[in-house]
Every structure is written in C-alpha cells, then in structure tokens.
Design a protein with these regions (language model features):
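Nucleic-acid endonuclease domains
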Residues: 1-56, 61, 71-263
Length: 263
C-alpha cells in the first residue's frame, strides 16, 4: 500500500511550504490535481494521467490503487462535495480507491497559495458499497407532441471527511481501515466506526406534474455492520484527537449545506 507514503510526502511538502500553482483565476479544477501530481512524480511512482472523465483521477501502474482528488476552497463549502456521476467507493475495477481532500484559500492574493489542511482517506469511509453501477438512462415521448427526450442523469453529493470527523479541520490526517497498517512514523489519533443503516434507497420516482421526488427503501442486507477506521497523524504534527461526529449532527450539517446550495 502506497497511501501512507504518499500522505507522508504530501505533509512534508506542506511543511516545506510547497505551494499550489494555478495557471490563472479560471483554473478551478486542476490546480490541486497538479500539486498532487508533483508529489507522485517526486516519489517516482508511475501513474496513468487523469482525464476529464476518468475515475479515479490517478491510477498507479504497479499497484492496484487509485486516488481521487477533491480541492475545496476555505472558507466556503466544506460539508459536502459534488461527486457528479460517480458514487464514492473504496474499490473500483479491482483497485483500492483513496480520496485526497485538500483545502486552500478562497481568495488568494495571487496564483500561488498553500494547502491549508489535508485528509487522505480510504473511499469506504465515504461509502461502503462497491457494487452499485451508475448508468444514465433516457426516454422519448415527453411534451405536447410526444417527441421530447428526457435524460435521467443522476448527480451525487457526498459528505467530506471534514463533515464526518471532528478534529480534521486545520490538520493533516490519514484515515485508513483498521486492517491497514501505515508503518513507522505514524501516530494513531482516533478510531471511528461507521454503522450501515437498516434501510437503503432502492428506487426513486419523479412526478412530472407535481415536481415531487419520492424514494422507496428496502432492508439493507448489511444492516448494522460496522466499518472501522483509524485516523493517523505524521510524527511531529499535532496529535489532537479525531472522532466520528454523531449521525444526527452530520445529517443536520449536510441539510444546511444543501439548503444554502439551493438558494
């Protein structure tokens, strides 16, 4: 597993003041990716270069691991992020998937600015199901003349580790499954247990007359199953604890974020 060493390299770069460099004010997508790319290159890790629609963003060549990057402006939206058409997961096409969340200043005074804090986590912290397959569907027949096409293009929004875990803000944190050992140089600062819900959404229906969306649930075959994660810090960093927020607090913050996004 390369995740721990990649995290170490990222933290060392942050400590050394290695800045994000954007090409211009309109570069809102690739600047953090480019910063991370340089960390992989510094480690001489071979990877497939990311494309606009590839998932995850970086796939290692000699190890079945992938890294999905999410840059977040701070202060700003931090409770959730747009997954677009890819539900977060911990495994994809035989690769273990890790997510890298980095926050940077919302209004930098130039095109070079620091990584404020960073979380590298296993994707199963965000969602434990690796079986769901996203597909876009459509039908024709809508409208007065029955010739308008309706596309069903699902877009997903998931919580960030900053919303899930207390103690991640303003720190650099590695979060792994409890079965994974990061090796020497890492100090555990918290254990988190995410419990699968009793009912999961299996269908939804959208009424074109009322613009109402309704969901149908079914029993979760893994109801009550706990997924255990351990948070680590690199030696030399602050060791204040990391803990999972209560579920009601997480949902409340996500609802608040969704309401602000709809305004």
């Amino acid at each position: 597993m390369n995740a721990a060493n990649i995290f170490r390299n990222c933290v060392q770069a942050i400590r050394q003041g290695v800045l994000i460099e954007r090409e211009g004010a309109n570069d809102k997508e690739f600047h953090f990716q480019n910063w991370f790319r340089k960390r992989l290159e510094a480690m001489s890790l071979n990877f497939d270069s990311p494309g606009r629609n590839t998932y995850p963003d970086f796939c290692l060549v000699h190890s079945p691991e992938g890294y999905e990057l999410k840059g977040l402006a701070y202060p700003g939206r931090e409770a959730d992020y747009d997954c677009n058409s890819q539900v977060p997961r911990g495994e994809h096409n035989g690769r273990q998937v890790f997510y890298v969340f980095g926050r940077y200043p919302t209004r930098p005074d130039g095109n070079r600015y620091p990584v404020l804090d960073l979380v590298l986590c296993h994707g199963s912290l965000l969602n434990a199901d690796n079986t769901y397959e996203h597909k876009n569907k459509s039908f024709r027949g809508f409208g007065s003349y029955g010739d308008i096409l309706v596309r069903d293009r699902k877009m997903y929004v998931a919580p960030t580790p900053f919303a899930l875990a207390e103690g991640t803000a303003h720190r650099n944190t590695l979060i792994l499954r409890d079965t994974e050992n990061p090796g020497p140089g890492f100090v555990p600062v918290g254990t988190m247990r995410r419990r699968e819900v009793d009912q999961i959404v299996v269908t939804y229906n959208f009424d074109l007359r009322s613009n109402c969306l309704e969901t149908t649930t079914a029993p979760n075959p893994n109801a009550g199953l706990e997924h255990i994660f351990v948070a680590y810090r690199l030696e030399g960093d602050p060791l204040d604890p990391v803990s999972l927020r209560p579920r009601e607090h997480i949902l409340s913050e996500l609802e608040s974020s969704a309401t602000c996004g709809d305004e």
